[in-house]
Amino acid sequence: PIVLMLMVFMNVVIKLIGEERINSLAQRFSKYSLVRNCILPFLAAFMLGNPASFTLGRFLPEFYKPSFYAALAQYNHTSNGLFPHINAGELFVFLGIASGVETLGLSTTPLAIRYLLVGLVMNAVGAYVTDFTTAYVCKKSGIQLSKTAKVQ
């Protein structure tokens, strides 16, 4: 039910702000790879959680959607230590590792911070690789994906 509520809320916000404004904002965000591959997926995961965060990808140009989804899927896991609301269904992975750290008498906070920081870097690298892979596949298959945002 919460996913449905978040999706309805997002659609209401889109209607209130207007699709043209959302499109222009998405166009500005998609220009810069750091924003597109690091900041936007993290904000989507933090605000909407998994799986509702994937709906924000609809505002990005078709060419950048694969890298956004790749980064977002990874952010949903690597942010769990500090922000368990993002992906509560898979919190057991972090908690299993954290219980081993606690058994050693160590704090889990540094582990969660390192997990997040390493995740931020590796997710961005994965998204960049996905951008190159998308360009390669498009070139080989003769498909041209749009680099301008359009919402239907």
Range-by-range predicted roles:
Residues P1-P61:
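Membrane-embedded alpha-helical segments and adjacent helix-loop junctions characteristic
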